[in-house]
Every structure is written in structure tokens, then in C-alpha cells.
Amino acid sequence: MISSSSCMFFLVFAFFLISPVRSSDVEALLSLKSSIDPSNSIPWRGTDPCNWEGVKKCMKGRVSKLVLENLNLSGSLNGKSLNQLDQLRVLSFKGNSLSGSIPNLSGLVNLKSLYLNDNNFSGEFPESLTSLHRLKTVVLSRNRFSGKIPSSLLRLSRLYTFYVQDNLFSGSIPPLNQATLRFFNVSNNQLSGHIPPTQALNRFNESSFTDNIALCGDQIQNSCNDTTGITSTPSAKPAIPVAKTRSRTKLIGIISGSICGGILILLLTFLLICLLWRRKRSKSKREERRSKRVAESKEAKTAETEEGTSDQKNKRFSWEKESEEGSVGTLVFLGRDITVVRYTMDDLLKASAETLGRGTLGSTYKAVMESGFIITVKRLKDAGFPRMDEFKRHIEILGRLKHPNLVPLRAYFQAKEECLLVYDYFPNGSLFSLIHGSKVSGSGKPLHWTSCLKIAEDLAMGLVYIHQNPGLTHGNLKSSNVLLGPDFESCLTDYGLSDLHDPYSIEDTSAASLFYKAPECRDLRKASTQPADVYSFGVLLLELLTGRTSFKDLVHKYGSDISTWVRAVREEETEVSEELNASEEKLQALLTIATACVAVKPENRPAMREVLKMVKDARAEAALFSFNSSDHSPGRWSDTIQSLPREDHMSI
């Protein structure tokens, strides 16, 4: 009888002769299978490993995507076998019963996405992962990992998703500050200390940090102080008992600290009394309040552009509550939704403010009320509208618009010289930040075609709903006016506000905003139209496909060659060159839609309802293609955002 080792030798030798995949990959796969598949759950048969279950993609004769999910695998990972697969881009063992520690994976130099969630892995965080400089996605949730989360994660400059929830990690959170970081969850561990107030970690709300031992920080509305015993240094170590010979020094230090602390408390109390007196005095003097408004207005003119953000947090709103004649303005809620949280103008005036952006129509703020409730407030630039009744009617029309792909307008405030619009707050950011990150240069990553189709369908449905109202348009469609909802659906904001803009204003429009507009509407004195919205939709679709913002008139520049330009950009920017060949039909469908929308003549553009039908047809064909190819694996970096359902996305 031939031994099992002899069979393995002959099998590997046969693959070396006839397989298009390099023999080392074949040997590595078979060795890996022997360590994690004792029940033979993986039916690897045939002569071409690229057709084996779980081998989702091969590039130039090398395995680049291995996805072995929910196959009842057990045992532990073989580091030697895995490191031989050095061309892997995606590796997933999600939803099995694998155990043990993670071996050294420093040989996977091309790895971009690692999914080890929902297993029984234990041990410390695999330090070798921090040397994989191309790594973007790390998902280790729902295992038994322990120890500290290493600060060496800062070396992963492309880190996009970091999920380690439901483990036993302890210590502090490292000060991650990658501009690319968009998804983060460390909840349900044993972490403690100060959550680092980095720009990257400040994006995430309390749900990313809940159920830990003793975390504190602005993100979870739990301030750090001496009484909690929590220090503000991420690398802080437990206190070491002081020897008896040094007890006197310690006592002197305690006494000195108490005296200094007492003096500091007295100074703070005095300062607080002064501030309260000044605030009371300012309320009684109208001119002092008006001077603050003027100062804020001047500041706005020198601030960043509409995609920029301000770090001037926790400032109080200084808008007026009364008009010059003394008539009190009113905060009016729109609609009759009893589930909407109600608040007063006084609550709004006491809210702390963070500038989210400044645009041609006004400034947008994140307002955090004393109760902790968060809203978005848009302060319109041209506060003195000559026809207030007309303004009120228009806003009430917008307030009646209710659709899953529209950011709801909840309330408005009007006085003679002040107009505010109140929207729901969307913490997941904008489509602009999704594509371009923190860059303002307008150059970002093209999204995968599945993501483009999902976003396009969301936006098309929102626009069709708006266009059902005769004469109503969005009027200012661009990626910064698309927000990501709680389920990462794309939602339109700032819709219908272009009619409120003063057409004779000398305020300049940025180039990026200008070239989203149809040629016939670039003269701001001309009213926006529904065909112009279709044109803007086409430009936005080109931005999704190329990652390039419209700082130039791309349609005029490339004309009939725009499809060639899009393909060239995607071939240059996408890291897997075979993507275009694998999805040519899908890309062509998107290009057909985009080029139809950006027709120079308005009468040649399809109606938004026709555009929606084209997008839905393309998505249906794409879904059929995905089903037939059995490719349900974790996607590229952009797929993890839009193409996955919310429950899958947040639970990986």
C-alpha cells in the first residue's frame, strides 16, 4: 500500500508539471489544508487550483485571493505554508473553529485584507501584521485574543478598517491617526485609559468603544480626571509601589500637589465667576452680541473651503435670537413625526459648535446640546430674505420630503437677519471623504464597480423622488453633499437650497463646485433645472469611477474620449490590473450611464427616472454575475463600504 506521504509527493509533482499555478503555491495550499481541514470539508479536486473552492483569484500564475469561510475548519494555521503564498492580497478564514495563536505572517508582503473573525484564536495581537505595509483591512473580532494592541499599528499607513471587538485585549488604545482609517471598533474588550484624541479616532462614536473596563475621553462623553485613576498617556504603566525609604519624599509630593491643586481650584472658581458675570452682561447688551456676529462673519471669509474642517470645537453659537425691531424669531419643526427629538431655541443657543464646512450657501455646524443630542445646523449666508413668506413656503415644501436617500430637514429658524436649517446628524461622513480621505487635492481612489453601482442607485432614487415635485431640483449635487447614513446608504443633503442663493452675490464659486454644474447653469443667475441635476449626477459618477474631483471641465476636455480616459485612470490606480478584464461589461454599463448624463445639450440627457432604470438593470446583471461566479468573498477596500449589508459590514 502506498503511504499518504508518497501520495502527497506524487500529487504535488503532477501539479508541478501540468498546473499553470506555481508549484510552491500548490504545495502550500495542500499543506495548509492538512493542518486546518481534518474532516476534509474543502473538496479540492481537479488539476487547476485556481478552480478550487476558496481560491477566488489568481494573478500571473500565483494565488492572490484565498477565502475559506464558514467551512467548519479546525486546527491551527500553518505559518510556513501561508508565508509561501506571498502574492496573496485577500485572506479570509471567517466563521470557522480555528484556534491557537496567529503565526508570523511577515512573508505576506502583498496582503491588503485579513479576515480572521468568528473563530477561537487566542494569544497576543500578531505583531508581524504591523510590518505588512500594504495592509488596509484587519478584522480579528469575536475571538479570544489578549494582551495589548500594539502602537506599531501606526506603521500601517494605509489602514482603512480595524475591527477587534469581542476579544480580551487589555491596556490602552494606541494613538492611531491614519488619515485613511474609516472603520474602527474595539468594543467589548478589557481596555482602559484615555482614548487618544487623534483626528482619526475622533471620527468614531461611542459604539466603537463601549463595554471596556475603564476608558475615558471625548468620544464616549466620559472625561478623564485624577479621581478615576486614568492617565491621559496611552503608554501609561501601572504604578509601582514606592520603597519605604522614599515614603517621606512621596509625602512631600502629596502635600505639594494638594496645595497646588487647591490654588488651581481657587483660580478656576474665580475665572468661572468672571465668565458667568460676563455672559450675563453680554445678554443684556444687544450691540455686544451683534459685534460677535460680525467677527464670526469675518472669520468665515478667511476659513477653509467647503470640504475643509475646523478644529475650533466647543464654541457657543452666536446667532441672533431677535430681529432689530425686537420681534422674536421662532424655531419651527417640520412634519408630524412624533419620534423626532424636540428641543427649544434656548437649547440650541447653549449647544457647543464645531464647523463641518463652509459653502456658497452658508456654513454647516455640528451642534452638541447639553443633553448630548447631536444635530447639524446650516446657517444660510443671505440672512435677510426680502420675501420671508416665500422662504417659509419653500422650506416647508422641503420639510415634507421624506425618503431613505434624503437627509431629513427637521426644523428651521427665521428672524429678519437670521435663517437656520436643522438636519439630522450623520456621523459616517460624506462621499467626498470616502473617495478622497483627508485630501483636498481632488485625487483619490477609484471605487470598485460594485460600490459605484450601489451609490449610483441610492442617489438616483433620491433624485427621482425630488424630481416628482414639479419644478423642484437638487441644484447643488456633488460628493460633499452626499452623506453616508447609518446603514452606509448614500443620502442627499442641501437639496432644494439653490433657489435661496442670491444670484447677484459676489461670492466666488469654487472650481470643483462649478464643474459639477451643467454648462447652461454655470451662470449663477440662471435657475437650476432637473436636466442640470442629471448632468451633475453624471459628473459624480465619473468621480466614483476615477477618484478625481472635477476641478476641470472633464466633459469639455475629453469629449468623446472620456471613456478611454476613465479606463486609463482605473488601470493606473487600481492595484489589480486584471480587474478591468474581469468586469469590462460592468464598467461599460457605468460609462454608458455617465456619458448619457453629461451630454452637453440638456435635451439629449435622459430623465432621472430613465437613469434609475439603467442603474437598476446594471445592478441586476452584476448580481447575477456574482451569483454565477460564486464570488461572495470580502471585496476590495471600497467594497467593504457600500456593497455589503449593514449587518455584515458591522459584524465582520
UniProtKB/Swiss-Prot annotation:
Residues 278-652 are cytoplasmic. ATP binds at residues 356-364, 378. Gene3D superfamilies: Phosphorylase Kinase, domain 1, Ribonuclease Inhibitor, Transferase(Phosphotransferase) domain 1. Keywords: ATP-binding, Cell membrane, Glycoprotein, Leucine-rich repeat, Membrane, Nucleotide-binding, Phosphoprotein, Receptor, Repeat, Signal, Transmembrane, Transmembrane helix. It is found in: Cell membrane. One of its GO terms (cellular component) is plasma membrane. It is a single-pass type I membrane protein. Residues 286-321, 630-652 are annotated as: Disordered. Residues 350-624 form the Protein kinase domain. The chain crosses the membrane at residues 257-277. One of its GO terms (molecular function) is ATP binding. The modification Phosphothreonine is found at residue 509. It comes from the Eukaryota. Residues 24-256 are extracellular. Its main location: membrane. Residues 1-23 form the signal peptide. SUPFAM superfamilies: L domain-like, Protein kinase-like (PK-like). The keyword Cytoplasm does not apply. The modification Phosphoserine is found at residues 352, 430, 433. LRR repeats lie at residues 64-84, 85-108, 109-132, 134-156, 158-178, 179-203. PROSITE patterns: PROTEIN_KINASE_DOM (PS50011). InterPro entries: Kinase-like_dom_sf, Leu-rich_rpt, Leu-rich_rpt_4, LRR_dom_sf, LRR_N_plant-typ, PRK1-6/SRF4-like, Prot_kinase_dom, TM_ErbB1. Glycans are attached at residues 72, 104, 120, 185, 205, 225. Belongs to the protein kinase superfamily. Ser/Thr protein kinase family. This is Inactive leucine-rich repeat receptor-like serine/threonine-protein kinase At1g60630. It comes from Arabidopsis thaliana (Mouse-ear cress). The lineage of its organism: Eukaryota, Viridiplantae, Streptophyta, Embryophyta, Tracheophyta.
